[in-house]
UniProtKB/Swiss-Prot annotation:
Transmembrane segments: none annotated. Its main location: secreted. Keywords: Amidation, Secreted. Expressed by the skin glands. It comes from Pelophylax ridibundus (Marsh frog). It comes from the Eukaryota. This is Temporin-1R. Belongs to the frog skin active peptide (FSAP) family. Temporin subfamily. The modification Phenylalanine amide is found at residue 13. GO terms for cellular component: extracellular region.
Amino acid sequence: FLSGLVGALAKMF
């Protein structure tokens, strides 16, 4: 879960 969340956040930036 955290992995996907961090990945999506990093993709935004």
